[in-house]
Amino acid sequence: SAGQSFGAFSSKGLKLVLKGDANDYVGKGLSGATISIRLPEESNLVSNENTILGNTVLYGATSGKLFAAGQAGERFSVRNSGAVTVIEGCDSNGCEYMTGGTVVILGDVGDNFAAGMTGGMAFIYDKSQEFEKKVNPESVVWQNVETDYWKENLKNLIKEHHEETGSLLSHIHI
């Protein structure tokens, strides 16, 4: 395990690759670096069924990228103002107070998603059709991805996630 604050305040030009899990505050204050977190080759775990990141990931991130082959805990991408990320699920309060950046979640989200979110974009793969029950509707609107531009943008991010993490789940969505 990488412990607390893996990649905190990492700047442009730095790339961190972790084979294993990380605890809370991964990418806190991320400032341009790329962080890739994947399961070790010898692992028999299914990435999208397991948590690989702790709580409060990308807190206050301003730029950079995070790719993780697994789920995040609570308060994922809180106060994100510019980072781009692809993960495979998160617990409650995801994208809380987010003001910018792009979040792609290839799995379920927890309750109170996007509370206080005022900017940025979040793409959620809603296989269980539960998103509407979990999103906080007070500051966001949501809809299906309908234009070719956004479909291509999303496809490219998922492809990059697959390249960075080897995720089988992202390979399905390319």
Question: Would you name each region that the model predicts?
Answer:
Residues 1-172:
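Long, distal/terminal scaffolding or interaction modules
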